[in-house]
Amino acid sequence: MKKTILSWMLLMGSTISMNAAVNVNRIEPTDWYVGMKDASLQLMVYGKDIKNADVTVDYPGVRVDSLVRLDSPNYLLVYLNLDGVKAGEMTLNFKQGKQSKKVKYLLKNREMAGDKRIGFSNEDVLYMLMPDRFANGNPKNDAFKTMRDKTCDRTAPSLRHGGDLEGIRQHLDYFNQLGVTALWFTPVLENDSPNDGKNSTYHGYATTNYYRVDPRFGTNDEYKKLITEAHQKGLKVVMDMIFNHCGFEHPWVADMPTMDWFNCPEWLSPEYQTPEHQKKIGTMDGAATVNDKFQQTSYKLTPVLDPYASKIDMHETVDGWFVPSMPDLNQRNPHVIKYLIQNSEWWIETAGIDGIRMDTYPYADRDAMAHWMKVLGEEYPHFNTVGETWVTEPAYTAAWQKDSKLSEKNSYLPTVMDFAFFDRINSAKNEETDDWWNGMNRIYNVLCYDYLYPNPKSVMAFIENHDTDRFLGEGKDTLALKQALSLLLTINRTPQLYYGTEVLMNGTKSVTDGNVRKDFPGGWADDKHSAFTAEGRTNAENQMFNWLSRLLHWRQGNEVITKGKQTQFCTQKGVYVVARQYKGKSVMIVINGKNEANELNVARYAEIIGNAEKATDVTNGRTVLINKNVKLRPRQAMILEF
């Protein structure tokens, strides 16, 4: 009798399962584009017990190549072939037992062919900003009761302050006035993570939805509108992405699609999903208190290229989590990297971005990232991506650039970040220049290694960013700042500025990261001081803004700087000179690295000056006679054009 009852219960359970409604809660990508070189489309279907559904498609030319049933019962990967398919609305037919469901899915035409998309280059100057800290154009989206972090508090340096995309859009003319040509925002995608009272994910580096702009920044449509209007004003937009990790509140974490979706997934196993451990995970500094199964990255990037690297060092670098609240994605899983590749393509097609900045580039799997770059390069041959490669040695950085002879593997990464220049210029600012090692010798020496780079002009140089101390520290040394900017904007590099440099924003990380990510003055309606207008800026701010703006506008379209041959001279008596030459035109950057008055011995630079008798100092418009020695003020920077 008991056996009969048990059999009946099992039969009824099976029948109920077979007749249960088909649940399709979400499909990613949310829509797609026809005419891509890679005709394969991965659809990640989310829904309770969707794993065993069968799928057919009603649409001319679309073929279901495969259904991949993952470990979790709540995911199904549908691989479609769209070769030769035209745009339109197709129907996806899901069937489970006797139940079925039809879901409409839109296939769109592309706005332009991939080879028509032109990325940022060394002709641009990128202006990096943090949306939460730049301007609040819509106070109504500062906080939402439906999100885990409901706080907006400008008095707390590491909580959300309310800046948004609308605030950026309202100040597009400001960027034109300044003279920059491209904007790089820190990530704008949804970060639906809690705050612990001290820290939050206002920075955007803990993604919880790869297809949705964070509502506190705006909507997908507002992001597209911002980019469209930026393009109308001659500004490019670079999107910050993260393939290395996601946020802990991403649905993948609570319900892993496969057991190898993340690196070191042991910490996500059920026995560690207790309120106590959740609390530890939610704290940004939780690494010191978590259980021994947690593996944090060593932050040591050298093992990735080290020919003698141990397996344990590689594991700690690549597989360890960046912080406890950011689970480390396993790009070696082919379904993970396919998802991420499609996501980057979707944002290019949907929003019209002009470039990608990839966060924590070497922390992700090297081969998978190279595959992504190769695919993206084939689809968008003139697009540009810059990778964050935070090691201060040129040999390391150069090995990550596309076609490098220093690596046995091609990364296909067009642009790398120049942490070597950043490191040297921040040391030089505190030193007087001698004839060997200190001061501007650091810049001379680091540029000597440009022979290591396949393409030096596609190396992104900077003097500060959101992860470093401000160049000014806690001070206001404008002489050192002008020297650094004079070099940054004229050497054979792609230059990047950090918001607020033009109005002397300062700060160090010794206080908190938020101290180098302060709100831009005037970005909030109740600000008493606005740096967006000449009337609102102080005299010191206007002097710096005007000086930099003059230089930025001069750089626009200047082929001597973007195409010219570069020549540098060993320092002599504290003077450092770099020259650029193109089609009979010359520019000499002259840096007095001494704290006292000095002199430029023009005879030493005859190979550049030739028969020229006078030049224009771009920094102030004055005429300078160069047929005789030139007097230099303490720590002066001159940019001589002739």
Can you name each region flagged by the protein language model?
Residues 1-26:
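Bacterial Sec-dependent N-terminal signal peptides
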Residues 20, 98-102, 106-125, 176, ...:
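Carbohydrate-interacting/catalytic domains
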Residues 21-51, 109:
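Beta-strand/beta-sandwich contexts
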Residues 37-97:
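Immunoglobulin-like IPT/TIG beta-sandwich domains and homologous Ig-like subdomains
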Residues 127, 183-185, 237-239, 356, ...:
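Hydrophobic faces of well-ordered beta-strands that scaffold small-molecule active sites
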Residues 135-345, 350, 369-378, 389, ...:
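Substrate-binding/active-site clefts of carbohydrate-active enzymes
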Residues 456-476:
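Active-site clefts of carbohydrate-active enzymes
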